[in-house]
């Protein structure tokens, strides 16, 4: 009995992590359902998908935000295309400037989709490696006994035997409908059973792909949907992808079809949750903005307050806000506004301007008050 050695110059850096996550879930479900149970292996594949998608949650949220930003900026992008359509270099510079202004990177929006590619390849290779009696590209051609005595990455030879023995009504989880070779590796194989189990799984995977694409398209803005390129991609996602799943299903192991179905179910639910969360955040931001405007708005019936940028007008050292009436009361702003204010000007001191006695001034134009005299109002 042996396990596969780790090869640092191969894709083992992908195969081993994927196999390890699947192995953990398999051990948990096998403890309840049994090691050779079809649903124990099926659930391990499904929860492998859920685990990887949960790890990619934050990049997925960033992808949704980037997509929404791109839709909001479509009018400006089309304006740039009309203006610099013939100058590709200038167009690229203006697009980079627009992206920097709004702080987003379109490449980040593709990260979740790109990250799933090596995961899919890793799972596909790990599932194929359970049955090495078929040979083929990158696979040794082993006998049935040698195959059951060889481990599969983190799976022991005993686990390999349990995988090959797991079936539903004679349909092994690692078999596919058009399989012609490697049938002896399974303890029980029935092609009608594989077709009977595989067709509903294909249809469900295709339907899940369709509704997932439909939900994504429904959340696009009207301006984005009017773009010819976007409209073409929407049609491909809405019709070609689901059709491709159904057509390609007979050539894929049942576990891969289950992987595709689980991935689309998770994406549909996660997409609905993330869009609802982002819409609530946007609504909360709008509500806070309205509350700030309401708090800063003047009370009903009140006059707006003006802040003067000039020095306060004063008469003989008394400002408008500190004027005292004849009866000793402090004047309000409205009463002070009714006073004819005369600004004090400085003139050259001449003998005629000098007072002839203490507290009096001979200059009739001077407004210097006598000592102890109160300022009086002039009625308009």
UniProtKB/Swiss-Prot annotation:
One of its GO terms (molecular function) is membrane insertase activity. It is a multi-pass membrane protein. GO terms for biological process: protein insertion into membrane; protein transport. The keyword Chloroplast does not apply. Its main location: membrane. GO terms for cellular component: plasma membrane. It is found in: Cell membrane. Residues 367-380 have a biased composition (Basic residues). Pfam families: 60KD_IMP. The chain crosses the membrane at residues 4-24, 29-49, 107-127, 192-212, 238-258. Residues 287-308, 326-380 are annotated as: Disordered. Keywords: Cell membrane, Chaperone, Membrane, Protein transport, Transmembrane, Transmembrane helix, Transport. NCBIfam families: PRK03449.1, yidC_oxa1_cterm. Belongs to the OXA1/ALB3/YidC family. Type 1 subfamily. Required for the insertion and/or proper folding and/or complex formation of integral membrane proteins into the membrane. Involved in integration of membrane proteins that insert both dependently and independently of the Sec translocase complex, as well as at least some lipoproteins. Aids folding of multispanning membrane proteins. Interacts with the Sec translocase complex via SecD. Specifically interacts with transmembrane segments of nascent integral membrane proteins during membrane integration. This is Membrane protein insertase YidC. It comes from Mycobacterium leprae (strain TN).
């Amino acid at each position: 009995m042996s396990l596969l050695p780790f090869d640092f110059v191969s894709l083992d850096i992908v195969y081993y992590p994927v196999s390890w996550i699947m192995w953990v879930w398999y051990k948990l479900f096998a403890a309840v359902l049994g090691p050779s149970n079809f649903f124990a292996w099926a659930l391990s594949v499904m929860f492998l998908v859920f685990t990887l998608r949960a790890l990619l949650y934050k990049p997925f949220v960033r992808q949704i935000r980037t997509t929404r930003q791109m839709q909001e900026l479509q009018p400006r992008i089309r304006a740039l295309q009309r203006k610099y359509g013939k100058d590709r270099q200038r167009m690229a510079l203006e697009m980079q400037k627009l992206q920097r202004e709004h702080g987003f990177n379109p490449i980040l929006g593709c990260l979740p989709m790109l990250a799933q590619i090596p995961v899919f390849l890793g799972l596909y290779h790990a599932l194929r490696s359970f049955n090495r009696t078929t040979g083929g590209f990158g696979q040794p051609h082993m006998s049935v006994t040698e195959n059951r005595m060889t481990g599969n990455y983190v799976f022991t030879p005993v686990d390999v035997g349990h995988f090959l023995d797991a079936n539903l009504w004679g349909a092994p989880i690692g078999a596919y409908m058009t399989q012609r070779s490697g049938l002896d590796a399974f303890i029980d194989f029935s092609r009608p059973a594989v077709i009977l189990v595989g067709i509903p799984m294909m249809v469900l995977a295709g339907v899940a792909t369709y509704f997932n694409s439909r939900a994504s398209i429904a959340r696009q803005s009207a301006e984005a949907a009017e773009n010819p390129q976007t409209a073409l991609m929407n049609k491909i996602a809405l019709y070609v992808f689901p059709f491709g799943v159904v057509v390609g299903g007979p050539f894929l192991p049942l576990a891969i079809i289950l992987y595709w179905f689980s991935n689309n179910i998770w994406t549909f639910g996660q997409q609905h949750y993330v869009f609802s969360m982002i819409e609530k955040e946007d609504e909360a931001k709008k509500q806070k903005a309205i509350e700030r405007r309401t708090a800063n708005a003047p009370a009903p019936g009140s006059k707006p307050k003006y802040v003067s940028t000039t020095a306060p007008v004063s008469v003989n050292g008394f400002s408008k806000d500190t004027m005292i009436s004849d009866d000793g009361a402090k004047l309000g702003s409205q009463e002070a506004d009714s006073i004819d204010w005369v600004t004090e000007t400085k003139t050259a001191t001449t003998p005629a301007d000098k007072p002839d006695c203490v507290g009096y001034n001979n200059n009739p134009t001077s407004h210097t008050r006598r000592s102890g005299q109160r300022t009086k109002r002039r009625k308009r």
